[in-house]
Amino acid sequence: MDHRLLEIVACPVCNGKLYFNKENLELVCKADNLAYPVRDGIPVLLENEARPLSIDEKHA
C-alpha cells in the first residue's frame, strides 16, 4: 500500500485515520473497529463492505 495514499484516505464513517493491515490486506479504523478490504490494490471504502474487527484484533 502506497504510504502517500494512507496519508490522504480516511474512514468513511468517522473521518479517522486508517492503518494498513498487510497480513489481511485491509485498511483498519481503530476508532470504529472496522476493516475495509483492499482489492487489486484499491481500497474499498464503503461502510457496507467493511467487516467488524474481532475482539482479538481490537486488542492487538
Swiss-Prot record:
Name of the protein described by the UniProt record: UPF0434 protein YE1549
Family: Belongs to the UPF0434 family.
Pfam families assigned: Trm112p
Listed InterPro entries: Trm112-like
Assigned GO CC terms: cytosol
